[in-house]
Every structure is written in C-alpha cells, then in structure tokens.
UniProtKB/Swiss-Prot annotation:
This is Nitrate import ATP-binding protein NrtC. The gene is nrtC. GO terms for cellular component: plasma membrane. It is found in: Cell inner membrane. GO terms for biological process: nitrate assimilation. It comes from Synechocystis sp. (strain ATCC 27184 / PCC 6803 / Kazusa). It is a peripheral membrane protein.
C-alpha cells in the first residue's frame, strides 16, 4: 500500500560563502500514513524545521524527494498548511479577516455563503467567537496561535505542519492549546507533522516520535512508537504504564546526542591538504588469507593506493582474526580488513578486554561464506537443517563440534542464527570451536570438528578433497549481508583524517574493480600468490569466477552474488546492519546490550565518512536504507526496537543492558 507521505532518501545541502557546503540533512527516509500525528524532535540545528519546510514545499531537497499521494512536492500548496511559532497574522486585519484571507484565496470557487460558514465554523472550532472582530494587537499569545490554527484548518488541508506552535506560550496556555489541538485533530482526521523541543508535548500528541541526530549530516536516529490509545487526555496519558519509559527513552536519546563527539571537520581539513598532502603515507594493514581479501590485494597490485598518495602500504598477512584484533590493540597495525562485527566488539570491550573505540567507514565485501559438514552427515542422509536436528537428537550424549572463526564474525552469527532457527541451541545442543580459517580443513580431516562455517576457499577445498559438503551458503541465510569491513581506531582516524579519506577512496575503487567480472581471472592469479591466499586457483575460483560445487547431488551452479564487492551499494556501512550485529552479540551473551546503542552505532558505523570519500571520487553519494532486515526464516528486524527483536527469539541467552560511556573510554585509551 502506498504511503500517504513518503520522504524518500532526502539530503539537504547548503552552499557556504567560502565555496564549501554544509550538509544539514542526510538520507532522511520516512513513510507517514494518512491521519497520523508525527513529531520531530532533536537539538537545535538538527534540521527539524528544514525538513518541515521541504514537506510544505517552501524548500526543496538537494537530493531525493518528498512524495504525497504519489506526486512529488515541488512547491507550496493549500493541501499542506503551516502553523508557525510567530503566528504570521496581518496586524491590521481582525481575527475573522485573517481567516477569511485564506478561505477567499484557496476556496474562492465556493459560494459566498459557504465561505462565510467555513470561516464561522473554524472560529468556533478554536473558541474565538467573542474575539472575532479584534485585531492581533488586542489578543494574547495563545489567542493569536488559535487564530493561526483556525486559518490553517479553514482551507481544509490534508496535512497540518506545525513548527513549534506553542514554543512562545506560557505553560498554562500551552497546555490548554495542546488539549484543544488533540480534539481538533481527532475530529478532522487531518495528518499532522509537528516540530517540537518538548518531549512531553510530543508524547501527548503523537502516534510516532521521529528523533533526529545532531548535525551536520543529521539523520533519523530512532523512531519511537507511542502506543497510548486515543482519544487522549493529559492525566490519562501521564498515568499510562508506558509513559515514563517512553519519556525516559526520548530524554536519553537527546542526552546521547548532546554528548556525541562530532567529527564534521574531517572533510574540510582533508580538502585543505590538497594533492598528496597526507599526514601519513606508510600504512600497515592486516588481512586474513581468504578470497574476499581481494580489494586489498587489488588496491596494492593495481596501484590504487599509490594513486591516492599512499606510497608505502604494507599488507600484513595474519594467522587469525584474533591476531588482527591484537595488532590493532597493540598499534602494530594501522588498520585492517575485519569481520563485520569486530569494530563493535572492540569498541564494547567484548570478552573482558579494555574497550577500544573503532570506526568503520566502508563495507569491503558481502556474502562469500558457507556451512560445510563432514561427509559422515551426508552418508546419514542429512540434506537440510531439519535433517541435522534429527540426526543430532539421535545421539544426545555425543555432542558434535562445528568450527567458527571469531565470535564477532558473520560466520559465527549466521551459523548460530541458522542452527537456532532449526531449534538447535548452539550453546547446548552443539559445541562451537573457534579456529583460524586456514585450519578448518585440517581439523575436519583430523576429526577434531564435524563441520565449520568459513569463507572461501576453505569450503571448496574441503569439497574437492572429499572431506565435506556444503549444506548451506550464506545466500541461503541472508543474501547481501555485510561480511568484511575496514576497521580503524577512532583516534587514528581523528589524527590522520586525510590519510583515512585517501585509504577509503583507494579501497572503493579497488572494490569497483573487483566486481567487474572481466577482471576476476586476473584477480584470481593475484590471490593465488604466496603473499596473499597462497593456494591453487582451483580452490579459490568456485563462487568467485566459476560454478560453485556444494559437494552434494546438485549440479554445480553459478552464484553471481557469492562474492560481492561493489554492486548493489555493497560498500555502504549501514547502521541498521550494524545494529543487527549488535543484537546478535547480545543475544548470545557475548556483550551486554548497550543502553546507548544509538550513540555506539553512530560512532562506529560512519556513512558520513563513506559519503565524503564518494564525493571526492566524483561518485554519487550512495545511501543505504534505514530498512528492516529479514533473514531466511522471515523474522523481521526493525531498527527501532532492537531489544524487542532479541526477545522474540525462542532461543537466546539472558539479556543485560548497560550504558557504555564511549567518551570516557576514549580518554582512558589516550
């Protein structure tokens, strides 16, 4: 069903006198139903009024668009009426004449008696019959605002836009007008969008509260559903069981934004450096020998690092993901290709470690994994997840062991998700063993494990050695999931902003190169070199270039999305996807779920830096969706209720919620 109003990936950028630009709003996406009351809240300067102006047609988006009833809004119109904080009444006209001005202009085709009736009805609607012949100078502030509301409603609009309508009024008048507005909206069924700083006002009036982050590049940080039934009365709202929890969540969000550390100066500094004027040109970047290390290899071998001024990039081949994490902690590595959850895990101090604030400005690859089982399961007829559950249930005293590469890896999280969706508890019904990717096949052959979830080429290696078969690829579980990301210490990014920007640009171009299939054979030859993956192209090729053989009865087939580096906005560091990872780490007890999850996700996942790199390359500023995530079992993840999502699972560990004060962590590390 088409939404009544859709704000479709809107950016608003203002030019600056020095030739620069200020990105006020970034990637605003919101769908509004007819008759809904939406409040926009956030700190001053977050773009609330700018967004309202674009809905009204008084301003236009730089990118994206605002759609109402299937038509793009390009100019003001009488179906969208605005009520401003400053009333905007003509001082020489009476109450009646101010309202008549709107009616006579918009509804001029109606007979005069009908126009007069509309004017009278709206004066009565706001209770100003006795003041109808007074001028604005004779009215109180509250009465003036009632005139403004009556004038807006008199044109029979479909949408009422309120820009802090009660901000200048005393508390008693404000309260009375809020009650009256609720009654008017209830009677008229008009759709309302209101800008406010007052959290109590937002809760009283709204169906949903849209909370904007602090600018620049403000975006929707959280959307709060207000499940308080209508019609509402102030006392009943305050006494509702959810009122103080909702109010606390809004206040907490605003406090998070107040203390959030903003790094908007990065782009200006980077531009000022010019040319190859980077702060640091010699970098040590860690990687693991897997097929999807291709972007790093291509950036090195094809000269993308040098093109962007990074003259001395050393790719450090590490034995395990733990070694990558240790290298970052010890500052032996400047950065690394990381499993998708590692920047969050390091930031939160997963595993009892000292928290280390991290940044990821791009996803380097998507997909590329599979779940491989020992051939003994194939011989027992295990072809599906349900077959596996039944087989494991036959021998409850013999617990099978599966290998995974790192707790914060998508291999671990997707393997756990897959098992749990089949009623197999990954902590009770099976044993998960942490192993480096290159050691999976040898441990399978030795009988130390009964299967594993890992990236290529190790699944194909097991298949070709007739040691195992693939029961599922990650395309079967979550096609398009983030797999590897660029991980950097936050303090490093702040210290070397121009260098970080150059690194992201080089890797973006390398990712684009990787997803041109005409280059895949060349890249395959690079990957096979000893300093990189160091194994035969026979094992690296499946899924990357040639058909993927799962080692079962099925024919080998081309899986064009199996290794995804650039297409379909692959590189965008989606905050929704980062939040999904956070829920899974908490679901399995690896971390306490951070109470200030909005702040954590905003600090770690950095689409602003990604967008800056795209703009420097002359590319469109790609934007991901503030979207729901749905895996193969149909369970929908909604970013606005992460805790509720975890609790909907039948199998999960006890969930603890803790506040992580990231700025204090940063000071300790420095």
């Amino acid at each position: 069903m088409m939404p009544f109003i859709e704000i479709d990936h809107v950016d608003r950028i203002f030019p600056l006198p020095d030739g620069g630009r200020y990105i006020a709003l970034k990637n605003i996406e919101l769908k509004i139903s007819q008759g809904e009351f939406i409040s926009l809240i956030g700190h001053s300067g977050c773009g609330k009024s700018t967004l309202l102006n674009m809905i009204s047609g008084l301003d236009k988006p730089t990118f994206g668009g605002v759609i109402m009833e299937g038509k793009e809004i390009t100019e003001p119109g009488p179906e969208r009426m605005v009520v401003f904080q400053n009333y905007s009444l003509l001082p020489w006209l009476t109450v009646r004449q101010n309202i008549a001005l709107a009616v006579n202009r918009v509804l001029r085709d109606l007979p005069k008696p009908e126009q007069e009736k509309i004017i009278d009805d709206n004066i009565a609607l706001v209770g100003l019959q006795r003041a109808a012949h007074k001028r604005p100078g004779e009215l109180s502030g509250g009465m003036k605002q009632r005139v403004a509301i009556a004038r807006a409603l008199s044109t029979r609009p479909k949408v009422l836009l309120l820009d802090e309508p009660f901000g200048a009024l005393d508390a008693l008048t404000r309260g009375n007008l809020q009650e009256r507005l609720m009654e008017i909206v209830q009677e008229s069924g008009v759709t309302c969008i209101m800008v406010t700083h007052d959290v109590d006002e937002a809760l009283l009036l709204s169906d949903r509260v849209v909370m904007l982050t602090t600018g620049p590049e403000a975006h929707i940080g959280q959307i709060l559903e207000v499940p308080i039934p209508r019609p509402r009365h102030r006392l009943e709202v305050v006494n509702h069981p959810s009122y103080y929890a909702l109010r606390g969540e809004m206040v907490y969000f605003l406090n998070q934004q107040k203390r959030a550390k903003k790094v908007g100066a990065v782009s200006q500094f980077a531009e000022a450096m010019g040319g190859n004027g980077l702060e640091k040109i010699n970098l040590d970047l860690g990687f693991i020998p897997l097929t999807d290390c291709a972007p790093l290899v291509v950036a090195k071998e094809k000269g993308f690092f040098q093109k962007h001024g990074l003259e001395q990039v050393n790719l450090v081949k590490e034995p395990s993901w733990q070694a990558i994490a240790d290298g970052i902690r010890e500052r032996r590595l400047d950065g690394a290709q990381m499993v998708a959850g590692m920047p969050l895990a390091l930031t939160l101090g997963m595993g009892g470690k000292t928290p280390l604030p991290m940044v990821t400005a791009m996803v380097m690859s998507r997909n590329g994994n599979a779940i491989t089982l020992s051939k003994k399961f194939a011989e027992a007829g295990v072809k599906t997840l349900e077959d596996l559950r039944l087989k494991l249930a036959e021998t409850p005293d013999q617990v099978s062991t599966l290998g995974m590469v790192h707790p914060a890896s998508m291999q671990n999280l997707l393997l756990r998700y897959w098992l749990a969706s089949g009623s197999i508890d990954p902590d009770q019904d099976i044993n998960l063993m942490r192993l480096p990717p290159p050691q999976m096949v040898s441990n399978l052959e030795a009988g130390n494990i009964d299967g594993f979830c890992v990236g290529e080429p190790w699944n194909s290696y097991a298949v070709k050695q007739n040691l195992g078969y693939v029961i599922a690829t990650d395309l079967d579980i979550w096609n398009g999931h983030p797999e590897k990301v660029l991980g950097m210490r936050e303090e490093w990014v702040n210290k070397y902003p121009a260098t970080h920007l150059a690194l992201v640009k080089a890797l973006l171009e390398a990712c684009e190169y990787c997803d041109d299939r005409r280059h895949r054979q060349e890249i395959l030859d690079y990957l096979a070199l000893p300093q990189y993956v160091g194994t035969s192209t026979e094992y690296i090729s499946p899924g990357f270039l040639t058909e993927y053989d799962q080692g079962n009865d099925a024919e080998a087939e081309m899986l064009l999305d199996f290794n995804q580096f650039y297409v379909k906005q692959s590189n965008y560091p989606s905050r929704s996807e980062g939040l999904w990872i956070l829920t899974q780490l908490a679901r399995w007890g690896y971390i306490d779920f951070p109470k200030n999850w909005v702040e954590i996700i905003e600090r770690v996942r950095r689409p602003d830096l990604f967008g800056e790199a795209c703009r420097h390359l002359g590319w469109p500023d790609l934007e991901g969706d503030h979207h729901n995530v749905s895996l193969f079992d149909g369970m929908v993840f909604t970013p606005n209720d992460p805790l509720g999502y975890i609790k909907r699972f039948t199998i999960h560990r006890d969930i603890q919620v803790t506040e992580i004060l990231i700025d204090q962590i940063d000071q300790v590390n420095q």
